Amino acid sequence: MDWKGRDVISIRDFSKEDIEFVLKVAERLEEELNEKGSLDYARGKILATLFFEPSTRTRLSFESAMHRLGGSVIGFSSASSTSVKKGESLADTIKTVEQYSDVIVIRHPMEGAARLAAEVAGIPVINAGDGSNQHPTQTLLDLYTIKKAFGKIDGLTIGLLGDLKYGRTVHSLAEALAFYDVELYLISPELLRMPKHIVDELRERGVKVYETTDLEGAIPKLDVLYVTRIQRERFPDEEEYLKVKGSYQVNLEVLKNAKETLKVMHPLPRVDEIHPEVDKTKHALYFRQVFSGVPVRMALLGLTLGVLGV
C-alpha cells in the first residue's frame, strides 16, 4: 500500500501485513544506522511534536528518530507554553502547526484527539497517546522488541500485568497480539481489569485469554511479562487509586519460578512495580525496549513522509 501521507492513529487501522512491513523497515533502518551513524532520508523535512501531556521516552525518541533520518524538529512539551492556554482550539492549533511542518506527532489527554487532528490536518499525523485510548507506536516498538528477542511472536505466552483498565499501551498491544498465535494472561487487580469489549474481541479473534489476579501462579507459564504502572492520573478519585496502589511488584523472589528465558518488559516510566534488582538480570528487556523506539519511529516517519523509497 502507499504509506506516503498516511496517519498513524490506532493499531486498529493496521493489518498484520502493515505491522510486519513496519517491523521489517525498522530492522533495515537499524542496520543502516549501525553502519553509518546517521542517515539523510528526511533532509529538509520538519517534524512537529505537540505534547499536551508529559513524556520522556516517546517525545525524545521521535525527536532522535527524525534527527537520525536527517530531518529537523520543532514543537512543545507542555500546552502551558502555547496559545491553548489562551483558549485556542485543538483544530486551530493543528491547522497552524501544519503550516510549519511536514508531519505531526501528538500526545493529548483527550481520547480521540489524534483522530481529530488527523481530520483537520493536510499532513500526516502520528498518535503518541490519546488519553487511555491508544498508543500505536509503543505497540509497534513492543512487537519489534519481542521479535528481536525471540526471533518470532507466534507461539509465545505473554502476560500483561498491572493497570489494564486505564493503560493505553496494553490496550493497543493486546489488539495487535490478536494477529498472532499467542496465549495472553491478563493479570490485574479486579478494579483494573482489561475493558470487557477488548477481552471479548480478543476471544472472538481466536486468542486464548486468561484473566487472573495471581501473578505468582501465572509467571511460570510466561515467555514475556509486560508490566505497567498504575495510571494514577487517569483515576476519577484518589480513593480508588489508593485501593490498588502497590498491588504488584516484580522482584527476584517473584522471578525465581519464571522460565530461564522469560523477558520482562515495561513501557516506562516505572514507579515501584519492577524492583531495581531486576535490572541486572537476564530477564530485563525494558531498556532494550526503549532503544527500539528509535528505529521503529524512524520507519513510521520515513514511510509517512514518503522518503524511504519503499
From Swiss-Prot:
Reaction equation(s) it catalyzes: carbamoyl phosphate + L-aspartate = N-carbamoyl-L-aspartate + phosphate + H(+)
Binding site for L-aspartate: 86, 168, 229
Positions bound to carbamoyl phosphate: 57-58, 107, 135, 138, 268-269
Covalent S-S links between cysteines: none
Involved pathway(s): Pyrimidine metabolism; UMP biosynthesis via de novo pathway; (S)-dihydroorotate from bicarbonate: step 2/3
EC number per UniProt: 2.1.3.2
Entry keywords, A to Z: Pyrimidine biosynthesis, Transferase
Any single Pfam family the record assigns to this protein: OTCace_N
Entry GO CC: cytoplasm
GO BP field: 'de novo' pyrimidine nucleobase biosynthetic process; 'de novo' UMP biosynthetic process; glutamine metabolic process
GO molecular function, one term: amino acid binding
InterPro entries: Asp/Orn_carbamoyltranf_P-bd (IPR006132), Asp/Orn_carbamoylTrfase (IPR006130), Asp/Orn_carbamoylTrfase_sf (IPR036901), Asp_carbamoyltransf (IPR002082), Asp_carbamoyltransf_Asp/Orn-bd (IPR006131)
Protein role: Catalyzes the condensation of carbamoyl phosphate and aspartate to form carbamoyl aspartate and inorganic phosphate, the committed step in the de novo pyrimidine nucleotide biosynthesis pathway.
Family under the similarity heading: Belongs to the aspartate/ornithine carbamoyltransferase superfamily. ATCase family.
HAMAP family (UniProt xref): Asp_carb_tr
Complex and partners: Heterooligomer of catalytic and regulatory chains.
Protein name: Aspartate carbamoyltransferase catalytic subunit
UniProt organism field: Thermococcus kodakarensis (strain ATCC BAA-918 / JCM 12380 / KOD1)
